[in-house]
Amino acid sequence: MNIVGIDIGTTSICGVAVDIVSGDIVKSVTKQNNSFINSEKEYERIQDTEIIMQSVTGLLSELDAENAIAIGFSGQMHGIVYVDESGSALSPLYTWQDARAALDFKGGKTYAQALGCFAGYGLATDFYNEQNGLVPENAVCLCTVADYAAMRICGLKKPLVHITNAASLGCFDIKENRFTIDNPRLPEVTAEFKAIGEYKGVPVCAALGDNQASFIGSVSDSEDALINVGTGSQISWLSASPVDGGGLETRPFDGRNYLAAGCALCGGRAFAMLERLFREIASLAGDNTGSLYPQIDRLLETKTETTLSADCRFCGTRSDPNIRGSIGNISENNLTAADLAFAVLNGMSKELYDMYSSGGKMAKKLVCSGNGIRKNAALRRIVSGMFGCEIKIPLYAEEASYGAALAAAVAGGKFGNIYEACKIIKYKDE
């Protein structure tokens, strides 16, 4: 009795088949997303929707989806595909990286600012296209690529978009779960984990945004918080009401709770910068070594404190892109490799902790996902100590596709709600 989840990422597309009783992944398949279309326009970041669909249909076959209990999707948020009245794509996928809405519009504002959302968000991209005559003539609706994939495999003519994806398009009221602008191409929205149709007789759940799907696929206890460390880093937790301040963003979840999220733009990149610095220093001594991560890990095995401080906002913040990080409180005794490495990890943790504490959350435990913390024992120790919480690491790293599968199990009637479904998540022994 398997459930299938597929996550359509920017660079890869991952599918899993999950045993609904044990919670084990019985099969996992990942394909590179080689659908980017070369463009002469510097701001344009688009992908070929048909190439993406070829990968999706291939995964459905490899995962034996036609014999599954239910199928779920998640995917890269913010981007849009235009569809016609038959449900066919009329455009490439304008991805979240597309920066056309950051171009100057009128009155000293960009297209995104004029609309009231961020560049890369689907409705900002659509606004630019509308103003410049680029919306396909027969377009009747727009949606994310995961919505499109779910709609296509069901043979539907129009998408039904979950609030987790709808909000990512911009101009969305998360309390009322509706769009705040008039646009004839806006899709129908749902707050439920519900089936939108069937694939060869198997129910297909409304697609989720990858952020919320990753939370669902990682966190078994709704009182826990999730820390994800990749190139950037993020802390998120469920809240009964919207959370304001401290660099936090509130996102829709299930119509009952919200997902509070604090994002650090540098995150794991800060540790990568440190490793690059150490390699550069080693090369000065004639040692053109490869990765120094194993050596840094060993250096930190017994390191428990430092008087050196590091502000790791090296890439700015969402609210202030121009702010920069710093190394402080340097003395003749603490400017060492071990102290610097420990200070950077401490700074990475503190940036997340400051956002967490401003939201007033007191988590029971911290779930840690993403290779930046899965593979870094020293960072886990620092995070655990700073937050005062026990650490849990999901057994499976395919969090978004796993979360999509759990949502599908709810849509297929195998669990009463998403919180019940999450109880089958397994964790590594620490």
PLM ranges: what are they?
Residues M1-S91, N138, V202-A206, S291, ...:
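N-terminal glycine/serine-rich phosphate-binding loop of ATP-dependent small-molecule kinases
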Residues I8-T10, T110-N211:
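Gly/Ser/Thr-rich active-site cleft segment
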Residues V56-I69, N132-P136, T180-P184, L352-K365:
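Phosphate/pyrophosphate-binding loops at sites that engage ATP/ADP/AMP, CoA/4′-phosphopantetheine
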Residues N67-Q76, V140-L142, L226, K361-N371:
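Short glycine-rich phosphate-binding loop at a beta-alpha junction
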Residues T110, D126-G133, N138, M151, ...:
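A short helix-loop
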Residues A166-D254, C266, A378:
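ATP-dependent carbohydrate kinase catalytic cores
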Residues A213-G217, C263-G268, A272-E275, F342, ...:
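Glycine-rich phosphate-binding/hydrolytic loop that grips phosphoryl groups
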Residues T304-Y396:
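Activation-segment/catalytic-loop signature of the eukaryotic protein kinase fold
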